[in-house]
Amino acid sequence: MDIKKILAEVKRGCAELIDEERIEKLIKNYYEKGENFFIKAGFDPTAPDLHLGHSVVLTKMAFLQKHGAIVQFLIGDFTGQIGDPSGKSATRKKLDKEQVLINAKTYETQVFKVLDKEKTQIKFNSTWLNELGAAGIVELTSTFSVARMLERDDFTKRFKEQSPISICEFLYPLLQGYDSVALKSDIEMGGTDQKFNLLMGRQLQRVYNIGKEQAVIMMPLLEGLDGVNKMSKSLNNYIGVTEKANDMYAKILSISDELMFRYYELLSQKSLEEIAQIKKDIEQSNLHPKKAKENLALEITERFHSKEEANNAKSEFDRIHSQNALPSDMAEFEIQGKIWLAKALVECGLESSTSAARRSISANAVSVNSQKVSDEQMYLKQGEYILQIGKRKFAKLKVKE
């Protein structure tokens, strides 16, 4: 087995890797001695759905599962009630335990679309953090100083601005680090925004003398559909892993050619050699970028749905955009009495608010019965309408007297 080749795939797309020698040794020991190793990634269930940005870490862990890794998928049901302060400019609102547990349950079903279930352990950090007790918390806090905490950019900024920083926010990185002590993890993965917390795990493993210091793999934050900002539900530039196959396929096709290769690097399970060949074929005009994007969309959609659903999504997309046909699964709505178009777009689920609807209208993105609309004050009277925003959002509306 070519360990160097495997390591090159591990490093692919990484923003930073700490203790590469340890990772190489862990993989080597698996092939020479049959020894598995543990790789941890923590997810605070602060929202019910994961998106492709979250799956960057999952994809890397799925690769490592093929080479000896047992994934410790850690659901931060305890820390999720605090909220990770990383990158935040204000104290986060605490979530109640019931909502955290509801969100956590949905995570379990979503991650196995990427991870090998037989090589994955689902862990909840309340298991050991509830047992830590006051004495344990005091001992834990004694391992780190306030001065070190204030080295974090987000805390420093808030401290200088005299914005509130709660004590429990100081506790968050300590508790996340203690997770690595409890789990005896060999590797921890996370985004670049998690570096402080990830290094805390290494330090606490040393302090608690568990006989190992975890290596750290940091992945970059995936850009959203706009190609500029990180993928985020709040920015509406995300692709949810539970989205319908048709929507997932269409959204991936909407990304730029430049962003396509970023997605290939971070989300595709194709090898480095295969991706290099795709780039070469495009450069030599042997492969059209659109075809490469279609292949990527098929691969990712199949991962979260099925091969049949992915192929059906492609056929549906081609039918709509090549033949100017309407979606076969278009939602239908009925409304009594004439209605303001902006409100109709919200009622039909095409926009989240009338403000957003008005922005779409002013941006010339809204069509009514295939005709572009620019009048933000337009009303729909009795009749049947096909409402459309952009290339992907459709709804059929019947306005009754």
From Swiss-Prot:
It comes from the Bacteria. It is found in: Cytoplasm. It comes from Campylobacter jejuni (strain RM1221). This is Tyrosine--tRNA ligase. ATP binds at residue 233. A motif ('KMSKS' region) lies at residues 230-234. Keywords: Aminoacyl-tRNA synthetase, ATP-binding, Cytoplasm, Ligase, Nucleotide-binding, Protein biosynthesis, RNA-binding. Belongs to the class-I aminoacyl-tRNA synthetase family. TyrS type 2 subfamily. Homodimer. A motif ('HIGH' region) lies at residues 45-54. GO terms for biological process: tyrosyl-tRNA aminoacylation. Its EC number is 6.1.1.1. Residues 339-399 form the S4 RNA-binding domain. It catalyses: tRNA(Tyr) + L-tyrosine + ATP = L-tyrosyl-tRNA(Tyr) + AMP + diphosphate + H(+). The keyword RNA-binding applies. One of its GO terms (cellular component) is cytosol. One of its GO terms (molecular function) is RNA binding. PROSITE patterns: AA_TRNA_LIGASE_I, S4. Pfam families: SYY_C-terminal (PF22421), tRNA-synt_1b (PF00579). CDD domains: S4, TyrRS_core. Catalyzes the attachment of tyrosine to tRNA(Tyr) in a two-step reaction: tyrosine is first activated by ATP to form Tyr-AMP and then transferred to the acceptor end of tRNA(Tyr).
